[in-house]
């Protein structure tokens, strides 16, 4: 999704008879504004807060079972870029964790890439080496999850994913993943086209210009 916007917008300008919708795009309201080019994205920070609560419950369980002390409730976050979307996401996640375990602390590491399996796995491994007992991510590969699954040591390292379930690659360490369900958006987009309406006028949610 990220990075496709400029190219798709160029194509949309050449084909005004077709509606183009780019999830996670950010240029629909930039000049030239096209009536057939749209961006959409979910309020993923809300899902990340819920995932943080789940992570906090696991940390609390580990504390109560004597696996870690409250001071050892350290979480690591594999982040792609220092964008507002990423920062709001890990902030929401951290607040969710601390709503259950107030003593929890966090380490962040930016990879400067959305999709690099080996780098994301290495970053997660380094965070684990710095005593993080739970890893989450705002990046696109399974690298962090596999790092948690393969981590040795006496303390298990759990994982909270993004965009997809990680249970296949981390069956003993994956807790939950935050994902955006675009089905409603595209159902309403189709409805809008069938009834001659503007897509954003048919979305029951926050919209701004060509963005929903």
Q: Predicted regions span which residues?
A:
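A residue-level marker of the well-folded mature domains of exported/periplasmic proteins
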Residues: 1-212
């Amino acid at each position: 999704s990220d990075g496709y916007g400029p190219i798709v917008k160029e194509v949309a300008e050449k084909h005004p008879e077709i509606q183009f919708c780019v999830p996670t795009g950010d240029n629909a309201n930039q000049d030239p504004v096209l009536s057939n080019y749209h961006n959409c994205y979910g309020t993923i920070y809300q899902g990340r807060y819920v995932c943080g609560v789940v992570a906090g419950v696991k940390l609390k369980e580990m504390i109560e079972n004597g696996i870690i002390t409250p001071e050892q409730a350290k979480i690591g976050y594999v982040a792609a870029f220092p964008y507002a979307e990423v920062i709001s996401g890990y902030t929401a996640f951290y607040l969710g964790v601390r709503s259950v375990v107030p003593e929890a602390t966090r380490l962040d590491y930016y990879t400067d890439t959305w999709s690099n399996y080996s780098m994301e796995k290495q970053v997660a491994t380094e965070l684990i080496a710095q005593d993080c007992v739970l890893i989450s991510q705002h990046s696109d590969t399974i690298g962090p999850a596999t790092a948690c699954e393969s981590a040795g040591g006496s303390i298990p390292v759990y994982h909270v994913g993004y965009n997809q379930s990680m249970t296949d690659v981390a069956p003993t360490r994956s807790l939950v993943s935050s994902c955006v369900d675009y089905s409603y958006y595209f159902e309403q987009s189709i409805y809008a086209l069938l009834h001659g309406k503007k897509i954003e006028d048919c979305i029951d949610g926050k919209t701004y210009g060509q963005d929903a």
